Amino acid sequence: YADRILLYGPPGTGKTYAAATNKVGYTLEGEPNVYQITMTEDTASANLEGFYKPNSSGSFEWHDGIAIQAWRRGGRLVVNEIDHASPDAMTFLHAILDDKDIAQLTLNNDNKETVRPAKGFTVIATTNSLPESLPMALKDRFPVKINVDKIHPKALDMFPKSWHGVINDTSLSDDIETRISIRAWRE
């Protein structure tokens, strides 16, 4: 099965919605097993890997970052706007996105714990850019790339049926001046 998928396409087509809500991301008990983060130039690798945080006794405890939580639990990591990741975060993402048969990381915690992805771990990343515009080292880590050029039907269902035509027309408009993302319709 595909364990690393890149969803790309215009803003507002429901890429993140599709990545985060598909039932494949649920445990057998029906609990969500989806971990989501949006990349920015300010996102540090610690957000993905983990960090020390003071506890109630005044000492510091290690807290796994979102990517390591997903790794340990065999969850789905949704990386929104992956092309906006800081160089620090991108370096960490390269390791997370290695083939699961060879992937392993040594954490920066006190005992330098080595972790590997649990069975079921997947990554779905989103971008508004074409895959060809991504750095080769990133692009090559996604064996599956899907163009999402239409609004996700379930995302559209959040609105009254009478609005669907107008939302489709404005969200998918070729005119950048009149395009409105589906996210803007919810606000």
Task: Cite the ranges covered by each PLM segment.
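Conserved AAA+ ATPase small/helical "lid" subdomain
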Residues: 156-187
